[in-house]
């Protein structure tokens, strides 16, 4: 009984801290006001899953759009679990090439002539979505699926699925196990 009361009180406190839903969906134009790059990605991550995905790919169309890479396992575009796996993969590599040695968002190490062809987002709940993405990079058309989760107020990538390969989380788990 006591545990139930504590759980109810905790949920009530969380609900009281949440903004009304109408406020959360209003700033749809905010990402367009920012230049491509991390600030635009972070702002778009607060708006919705499709805006977040489009901002992720907008940086690949601009040379150096992401700026300096962040430390492995500390990138706010990935959820906590994926960041933990990326960090563990890098640490386990101990100076050698880690399993994740490319940008999983574009499945590439470099981008040239990058153009986003389509994004189709399917939201399976208030905190989960999948984005089927088609883009051209270096003359090659690629398709992949981003699994997305909402952590706090921001959408984040929780997994990357490339046809014909194991999911990114499966590859990383195999490498760090």
Question: What kind of region is each of these model predictions?
Answer:
Residues 79-140:
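Surface-exposed, charged secondary-structure patches
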Residues 17-20:
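Bacterial signal peptide processing site
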Residues 120, 144-150:
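Hydrophobic/aromatic beta-strand elements that line small-molecule binding cavities or substrate pockets
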Residues 150, 154-156:
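A general "mature secreted/periplasmic domain" signal
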Residues 37-96:
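Core segments of small alpha/beta cavity-forming domains
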Residues 124-127, 132, 138-142, 159-177:
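Low-complexity, intrinsically disordered terminal/linker segments enriched in charged
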Residues 1-15:
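Sec-dependent bacterial lipoprotein signal peptides
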Residues 23-38:
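Juxtamembrane proline-rich low-complexity "stalk" or linker regions positioned immediately after a signal peptide
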């Amino acid at each position: 009984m006591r545990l139930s009361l504590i759980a109810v009180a905790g949920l009530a406190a969380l609900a009281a801290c949440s903004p009304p839903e109408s406020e959360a969906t209003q700033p749809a134009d905010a990402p367009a006001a920012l230049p491509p790059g991390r600030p635009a990605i972070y702002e778009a991550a607060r708006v919705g899953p499709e805006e977040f995905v489009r901002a992720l790919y907008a940086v690949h169309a601009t040379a150096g759009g992401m700026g300096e890479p962040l430390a492995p396992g500390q990138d706010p575009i990935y959820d906590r679990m994926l960041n933990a796996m990326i960090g563990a993969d890098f640490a386990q590599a101990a100076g050698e090439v880690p399993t994740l040695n490319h940008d999983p968002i574009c499945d590439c190490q470099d981008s040239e002539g990058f153009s986003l062809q389509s994004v189709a987002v399917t939201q399976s709940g208030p905190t989960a979505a999948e984005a089927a993405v088609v883009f051209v990079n270096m003359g090659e058309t690629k398709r992949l699926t981003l699994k997305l989760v909402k952590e706090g107020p921001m959408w984040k990538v929780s997994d990357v699925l490339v046809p014909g390969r194991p999911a990114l989380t499966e590859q990383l788990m195999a490498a760090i196990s």
